[in-house]
């Protein structure tokens, strides 16, 4: 005797469920494979459920400072329909595309834009539109300084994590970053995590941050060679603080037996931790001649080396 069972077809899943599933697929497949399966999947891909979190950091590394990157963002971000919560991208070309992001940042909580060509004026002009941010990464953005940081701190009152790491070569000619340290201390009192690796910051600058950011739980000072903090004083004053950086030993336990596993990273006889697309149009319905305005698969073949293994969709139950 056959049991009566109800099966739900893949194309009948609710859009938010489809969006959650598709968000775990590689970007290329979401844009070139999924829309061709059926109309329901194509609608899900062009709707907001797939794009509440946009992580194209790896993809953007291939098109650093490129108009391809601008076009990708201009296509994907509006699909979120104002529900964008997280954006990870590297190498924004200029303030214009950053302003475009800010225009759609009403729900944005996490923003990662390292290695971008942003300027002080560009950040100042849009900082108030980023007020919902809790996490911001402006690492390796060499054209901004204390003015931009102060604007972020002034308008982003919910900011809890701030990354402002630099590359040693980018700061070789910089005399001091204390002005940035003071901007952070004076405008970001609720920070819980701060990364300022390889900043030319002084001991006074770091102490100013520590005295003002009383909720700080993690501080990265890797490569901040001018900072000298007394180990005993630090243990007594900030017993729960985790610090990664020179002249502060024993506050960062990433794994068990860290020193044994990574002894090569410690300088002998010192207190340092020494470590060093697409098409012009928007994807439309993939049916008959309507696909002539769709995604151009050759964009990937001509411009990047990507994993092109065939994707086999499971049959509908």
UniProtKB/Swiss-Prot annotation:
Q: Tell me the subunit arrangement.
A: Part of a SCF (SKP1-cullin-F-box) protein ligase complex. Interacts with CUL1, CUL2 and SPK1B/ASK2.
Record text about domains: The F-box is necessary for the interaction with ASK proteins.
The task this protein performs is described as: Component of SCF(ASK-cullin-F-box) E3 ubiquitin ligase complexes, which may mediate the ubiquitination and subsequent proteasomal degradation of target proteins.
Q: Reply yes or no: does the keyword Nucleus apply.
A: yes
Pathway(s) the chain acts in: Protein modification; protein ubiquitination
- Protein known as: F-box protein FBW2
Q: Name one GO cellular component term.
A: nucleus
Keyword hit for Nucleus: yes
The F-box domain, residue ranges: 7-54
Q: Which UniProt keywords apply?
A: Nucleus, Ubl conjugation pathway
Q: Which organism is it from?
A: Arabidopsis thaliana (Mouse-ear cress)
Mind listing the GO biological process terms from this record? negative regulation of gene expression; post-transcriptional regulation of gene expression; protein ubiquitination; response to abscisic acid; ubiquitin-dependent protein catabolic process
The subcellular location is: Nucleus
